[in-house]
Design a protein with these regions (language model features):
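Active-site environment of divalent metal-dependent phosphoester hydrolases
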Residues: 40-43, 73-78, 115, 139-142, ...
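Metal-dependent phosphoester-hydrolase catalytic domains
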Residues: 176-186, 194-312
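His/acidic metal-ligating clusters that form di-metal
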Residues: 159-192
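N-terminal, active-site-proximal structural segment of metallo-dependent hydrolase catalytic domains
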Residues: 18-82, 128, 301, 310-312
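Bacterial Sec-dependent N-terminal signal peptides
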Residues: 1-28
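Acidic/histidine-rich helix-loop elements
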Residues: 35-53, 137-162
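Active-site metal-binding loops of divalent metal-dependent hydrolases
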Residues: 36-38, 136, 191-192, 303
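Structured beta-strand-rich core segments of catalytic domains in phosphoester-bond hydrolases
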Residues: 66-145
């Protein structure tokens, strides 16, 4: 009788543990985020009449829960209507679309222009998540990076522009929210218009037209030092095997050989969020793009980043 009681007790404990484990798994939510510079709102004169519609089609095919759009330029209402999502038009340039309710909007116009930065808080089935969209200045042009120079000269060239100043302003205004990131996770993506130190390594110095250079690009260093993780590089840690090109997708239309690299990112931070998948889609402007088994005309000069996260 005692053996039977002990067995029943052990069985009950096992069932409770199994139920707790199952409940924990079921309580985790996934959130898929897409970041894309759609090139003049999808209505560039280069491909007049094609870009908008196919941009919407690709976004729908992605099944992203959140879309960070750069170079929105008039497309926001049509994108939101096409997806059936809530949206926040931060500026003519930046917009965010969400399958989940937007419960707060963020702008820091006194410190950083809304043309460069802004965000929202969304409610993912009771779990708040802060999401920010970013655009840093395109000059100095990454295509012209003097990779035949010393590391110091390359960094001096980069500092001639405003990207370093912009990212530090952004990180400064985010400080109070970063302090809460372990309870309310933060996702920050967009078009940073600059390379990453995680891509310009000793292993890649003689690849991808890097010209032998190993460069600690300041913007990605600043993001890392602020506690952000690069979702794509975390999921694809070998830049030799997968550089993750997002620019220039129209490189083969240029008269001279041009460096193609990763300048679009999705970063994240917080104890209750973890990247579980990420891909960069480096596609050629104006060419056929096969995505999830379907062919599309590709409308942008940027590829896009698609990252999937798990929320505790």
């Amino acid at each position: 009788m005692m053996i039977t009681r002990n067995f029943i007790g052990v069985l009950a404990l096992c069932l409770c543990a199994l139920a707790a484990c199952t409940s924990s798994k079921e309580s985790k939510k996934t959130l898929t985020v897409l970041s894309w510079n759609v090139w003049h709102g999808g209505h560039s004169k280069t491909y007049s009449g094609k870009g908008c519609e196919v941009t919407f089609d690709i976004l729908k095919k992605s099944e992203a829960d959140v879309v960070l759009m750069i170079e929105t330029y008039g497309a926001a209402p049509m994108v939101a209507d096409s997806l059936g999502y809530s949206y926040n038009l931060i500026s003519d340039n930046l917009s965010i679309y969400s399958r989940y309710p937007i419960i707060r909007k963020y702008a820091f116009a006194d410190s950083i222009s809304t043309f460069n930065f802004g965000g929202v808080m969304i409610d993912v089935d009771g779990k708040p998540v802060r999401v920010f969209n970013t655009w840093l200045h395109y000059l100095p042009d990454m295509r012209l990076a003097p990779t035949d120079k010393s590391k110091e000269e390359i960094l001096a060239w980069e500092m001639e522009g405003t990207r370093d100043e912009e990212i530090h302003k952004i990180l400064s205004v985010l400080q109070p929210l970063l302090a809460e990131a372990d309870s309310i996770p933060i996702i920050m993506g967009g078009d940073f218009n600059v390379h990453s130190h995680l891509d310009w390594t000793e292993a890649t110095r003689n690849l991808y037209l890097h010209g032998g250079a190993v460069v600690d690009w300041p913007v990605s260093i600043a993001m890392e030092e602020a506690g952000f993780k690069d979702s794509f590089r975390e999921m694809n840690p070998n830049p030799v095997a997968n550089l993750g090109v997002t620019w220039l997708t129209d490189a083969d239309s240029l008269e001279t050989e041009c460096r193609m690299d990763r300048i679009d990112f999705i970063y994240y931070q917080g104890k209750t969020i973890q990247a579980i998948a990420s891909e960069c889609y480096d596609n050629s402007l104006g060419k056929t793009f096969t995505f999830k088994g379907e062919d599309f005309f590709y409308p942008s000069d940027h590829g896009f980043v698609l990252s999937k996260f798990e929320l505790d």
